[in-house]
Structures are given as structure tokens and as C-alpha cells.
Amino acid sequence: MGPNGAMILFHRSADWWPYCKAQLVELQDRLQELEGSGIGVAAISYDSTRVLFEFAEKRGISFSLLSDKDSAVITEFGILNTVVAEALGPKRDDPEVVAAVHKYVAASVFDSIQLRQMINGTPFPGTFMLDAQGRVISRYFEEFYRERSTTSNVLLKAGIGLTPIAAIEGTTAQLKFTAYPSNTTVTNGTRFSLAVDVEPHPNMHVYAPGAEKMGYRVVGFNMNPSELVRFEPVNFPEPEIYHFKPLDEHVEVYQKKFTLLQEAVVNASAEAEEIMEELDALTLSGSFDYQACDDAICYLPDSIPITFTLELEHLDYQRVNQR
């Protein structure tokens, strides 16, 4: 536990599951920043202490990897993957159980009784954020067993500031902006964020969701579709209400510095993995769109092109005891 709280990561395995390995390595990359913010870090799985020691030694992990061999802590937190146990019981061939297995346990092409037995005891993977008193203040879990939120993404969603990496900066007549990815390296199943920090100039405002009802162009962060990345709906902060006295309008705006978050998920399908094996990087393009006004003038809408290039890291399928 750090002086300002802790991040507790529950994962399936540092031995046989490549998506968890990638998540743990990315967490290590952010460890100095977390500790500098007074946040302690630990990761929990049903792996043996030997497996965790060897993985930490191999990948340079310095934070605590804790063994919950009998899944007691996992069960106490209420995140034991009960789908696995059900899939080993008398209803294992029930179509609904099989469908749940393919969403929360293993793809149909890999599914077997032996695999289910190996996975039994794992948690639904996710992250808990604790305050300084050890109370859970937020939690982040995935809907699909191959997807993993990065540490950087969790911190952005929790409102904990990051040092922007590979930022794109610009200034227009009405505002300043900085666009950056939460992570510059991604892999299959990575859930990350693209962010735009926006600071209107003095006496300027841009329009927030809700203002479209009055005919104004709302600020937007619009990424072009990609076959390898799924974009979630943009997260908008709460707006202010601006009173435009000449027309007696009350309209939703942003006048102070704010951040738009565009969460994105790298495709985790076998087909996408095959495509990405031939790639070294992902290029994602889109635009930051807005209309700005001051107390007297509404300026023409503007659209600023934005492109991010992210390094691709390939999944690690090698088990800990394999050399």
C-alpha cells in the first residue's frame, strides 16, 4: 500500500496467458510513475510462487507478484471465474454454458476439458484502485477474456494525470491542444486511450454535448475506422452552462481546460493476430473538431487532423519453464 492508495491487478496467469504477460510488463513500465504518485502496486493470480519468481526474473518485474494458489483471495473479492467450474459440471455441454465459455474462458478452437481444468481457479481479470485506507474506490474489468486495460488507461480513466508520451501539440486562434496516446506500444487485446487536452484561450468557449440542440457544432474527437482497432464512444467531461445574454441562451460549453478520452481496443481475434504478425506499427488517424466563440463572435467550425503511430509488440506464448 502506498501513502495515496494502491492498484491491485488480478490476472489469469503469468505462465500460460500472453495477454496477462503483456499487461504485467506494461504495468512495470509505469511503476516509477505510480510510485511517484504514492500508489502501491501488486498483482495477484493462482500461479505458484515458483512461476511468479521465474516470470519476474525473466521480464524484470520489480513489483509484488502474489500467489493465491487456492484462489481464496480471488473468491473473497467475488471475481472467481465461475463459468469455468460450471463448464466442468453436468451442464458443460449446455449451449448457453458453451457460449459463456467462449466469451469468458477460451475460444472454441482451443476449448477442451483439459484446458478448462487448467483455467479453473482463475479470476475475471481486472484492476481495483484503493484509497489510502484500503477501500475500493474504482474497479475496471473486461467483457472479453482476451482484452486487457493498460495501466496508463486505468490511470487516465481514474483522473490520475500522466506525463504525455509522443504528444502532438498545436495552437489555433481560439485554443491550445495536446493529443497523445496512453500507450505508445500495444498488442492484441490492448485496451488503451487516445486523449486530447484542450485549453480555450481567455474569453473563449467551445461547445459541449447538448449544444447541438441549439444548432452549434459540438467538440468532437473522431477517429477513422480501422479493421484492427475498435473505438468506444468518446468520454466527455461535464460541461458548464454559458449564458449568452444578447439572445438569452443557456448552452453547454467548455471554457476551462478539459480532456476528451477516446478508448480503443486492439482486435484480439486469431485473424487479426495473423495480420499483425507482419506489422511493426499501427497508424491511427482522425480529427479533433470544434466550433469556438467569444462573447461577441462565433467562429467558423474547424477540424484538425491527428495521427498516432503505435509500436506493435507481439504476444509472448512461451511458458515460464520453457527456455
Indicate where each model-derived feature is located.
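Structural microenvironment flanking redox-active thiols in thiol-disulfide oxidoreductases
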Residues: 21-76, 82-83
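Extracellular/lumen-exposed scaffold segments
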Residues: 156-323
